[in-house]
Amino acid sequence: MRSDRVKAGFERAPHRSLMRATGMTDEDLSRPFIAICNSFNEVIPGHVHLNRVAALIKEEVRKAGGTPVEFNLPGVCDGIAMGHGGMKFSLASRELIADSVETMLSAHAFDAMICIPNCDKIVPGMIMGALRCNIPTIFCSGGPMAAGMAEDGTVLDLNSVFEAVARFKAGKINEEELHSLECRACPGAGSCSGMFTANSMNCLSEVIGLALPGNGSLLATSEERKEFWKQTARRAVEMAKADGPLPRDIVTRDAIDNAFTIDMAMGGSSNTVLHTLAIAREAGVEYDLQRINDISRRTPNICKVAPSSRFHMQDVLRAGGVSAIIHEIARIPGALHLDAMTVSGKTLGETVEGCGIADETVIHPLENAYSRDGGLAILFGNLAEEGAVVKKAGVHPNMMSFRGPAVIFESQEEACEGILAGKVKSGDVVVIRNEGPKGGPGMQEMLAPTSYIMGQGLGAEVALITDGRFSGATHGACIGHISPEAAEGGLIGLLRNGDIIEYSIPDRTLNVCLSEEEIARRRADWKPTYNRVSSSWLSRYRQLATNASKGAVLRRGE
């Protein structure tokens, strides 16, 4: 066993003495050690129940013949961090989590690991750490939250409240109505109920092969979820005894292709591009944005979930879950690598046998796809020489191609103030810059400004571009991850108010209408602009972060 490195032989008597101090017995020491990598905290609704999840899993691990050893990692609630300086720490926390997993696994010898994440950066951070250490690892998320419900029966989620803020500011609803939405949108434990970043990544963990079927859609509070957690615990002990499969056996180029294919089919969050690129890097897989575009062009979008439709994860579950989406896309010859291995010990194709669509209003058959290409698109042009990302599944049909004058804001906070003050009009292109990985630093999400645009009724009349990123709850003509970012000399940093910006999502282009001579003149006068930051951690992140086209990961030292 891998754990013999810290528990076998007379030389390890001191080590065993310390383990006995934690309550371990001779029997415990004789069994495989199963790391329970938990992200429980009382801050995030998606994580508030994970202490109970871990307790259930540990009990099942013991029954299966393993010795569970739990440790915890930090986690940021993007919703609570939204709209203020706390959001600068969100993406950076992914690297912190990956480093923490690596630290705990490297310092202590485990035979296998069960990861219990749920929300945005915690999922990819744990995957990245698992890939570095490459011991048998299985993921089981905390599960999605049920959708809320308004007094009139309207289905709600967190985004409903963000958009209600703008409606309240505009005088369209009163304070009592806003308070009612606030109290009803998030009814209990679980990751926010739409196809936002957390649920997108939990679905993709299943597709990549690191989690058992059901990981993405079984509701957090359901009895089925409890059985799923138990099943995961039993499988982890089997993997420990077999010493496999290992994360790097599973996360291959084929698995990353599969992830992006299903991402396109289900209209996942634009953040999945950042995170899956980062995961590929840790797996030693070279992967570029053009490959993602190629997958998008050949993959139909067959499922739209909030914020792109009225449906939520509970509806996806009712319709057959992620397995039904995989099964339907597998009808396209060559669309998926069905022989890719998963933690179940079966191939991806074997795990979805017989998993048809149960509700075709939620998951469409291929013949009735929302579009013939995928829910995400990568744009290129003079404004995005290294790429930009748009969640096209959430863009109004009138906004698939657009041309308009730039209204420039130097930060998210400035943009929020300007939008609420009425500085943005129909036909404008909002530009929010200096919010990239380096410029922010931290690449803030832009849910507040995009929600304010929607709340003012401008969602089909205004576009927004940024070197920052968006919440998975964002919808509308919102183009993010512009690379190179302003802080590294990207053209977005040279724009002026009134410059004409045009994009075409079908053609995958994003440009500003300036001559090469004018661009050269502006560049000659350009000086890098960085938002000031007092945080030691964010200062280090700024120094080491790559841009979004490379996953905003930290550069490694030699």
From Swiss-Prot:
Q: Which UniProt keywords apply?
A: 2Fe-2S, Amino-acid biosynthesis, Branched-chain amino acid biosynthesis, Iron, Iron-sulfur, Lyase, Magnesium, Metal-binding
Share what the entry says about its subunit structure, partners included: Homodimer.
Binding site residues for Mg(2+):
D78, D120, K121, E445
Query: Does the record bear tRNA-binding in its keywords?
Result: no
Q: What is its EC number?
A: 4.2.1.9
* Name under which the protein is recorded: Dihydroxy-acid dehydratase
User: Which top-level group of life is the source organism from?
Assistant: Bacteria
Catalytic residues, per the record, are S471 (proton acceptor)
| Pathway assignment | Amino-acid biosynthesis; L-isoleucine biosynthesis; L-isoleucine from 2-oxobutanoate: step 3/4; Amino-acid biosynthesis; L-valine biosynthesis; L-valine from pyruvate: step 3/4
Chain positions recorded as [2Fe-2S] cluster binding sites: C119, C192
User: EC top class, in one word?
Assistant: lyase
As cofactor, the record names:
[2Fe-2S] cluster; Mg(2+)
Q: Which GO terms describe its biological process?
A: isoleucine biosynthetic process; L-valine biosynthetic process
- What does it catalyze? (2R)-2,3-dihydroxy-3-methylbutanoate = 3-methyl-2-oxobutanoate + H2O; (2R,3R)-2,3-dihydroxy-3-methylpentanoate = (S)-3-methyl-2-oxopentanoate + H2O
Locate the N6-carboxylysine modifications and list their residues.
K121
- Which family is it part of? Belongs to the IlvD/Edd family.
- Listed NCBIfam families: ilvD (TIGR00110), PRK00911.1 (NF002068)
GO molecular function annotations of the record:
2 iron, 2 sulfur cluster binding; dihydroxy-acid dehydratase activity; magnesium ion binding
How the cofactor is bound: the record states: Binds 1 [2Fe-2S] cluster per subunit. This cluster acts as a Lewis acid cofactor.
* Taxonomic source organism: Akkermansia muciniphila (strain ATCC BAA-835 / DSM 22959 / JCM 33894 / BCRC 81048 / CCUG 64013 / CIP 107961 / Muc)
**Any idea what job this protein has?**
Functions in the biosynthesis of branched-chain amino acids. Catalyzes the dehydration of (2R,3R)-2,3-dihydroxy-3-methylpentanoate (2,3-dihydroxy-3-methylvalerate) into 2-oxo-3-methylpentanoate (2-oxo-3-methylvalerate) and of (2R)-2,3-dihydroxy-3-methylbutanoate (2,3-dihydroxyisovalerate) into 2-oxo-3-methylbutanoate (2-oxoisovalerate), the penultimate precursor to L-isoleucine and L-valine, respectively.
Name any GO cellular component annotation. Answer: cytosol
Q: Is this entry keyworded tRNA processing?
A: no
